[in-house]
Amino acid sequence: MKENKKAILEILKKKSKKDGKFENLVLNLALQKIDSDSFEFDGDAVYTNDKKRLVYCMSQEASFAIPEGVEIIGEMAFRGKKALKNIIIANSVKEIEHDAFYDCDELDNVYVPAGVKVVKSYAF
């Protein structure tokens, strides 16, 4: 299991356009907390294996659409994404956790559907 976690971390590091200390810290914590068989990476973000929780976004794009099926935007999932300007939250999302979009200074346009029932403190 340890080798599997290390291999996944290496893949995520290579996919990251900026290999910053914060991203490495978040990825290491995610790998320690979550069994490696419990999440997947689609090239832009890390999700739980059932794709109901967005754990961490690695995209450096100005716009991001959270895919349908995601129910929870995880704590610090988008934290520090300086280039992020537009976010479209899928209708399936029910909860936005603490600090999910913290330090996204350029975030200008957010679509939050009516189905979002919980927005925890400091989410934005």
Which residues fall in each region the model found?
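Consensus positions within tandem repeat domains that build extended binding/scaffold surfaces
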Residues: 74-77, 97-102, 120-123
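Structural signature of tandem-repeat unit edges
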Residues: 1-47, 52, 57-72, 81-95, ...
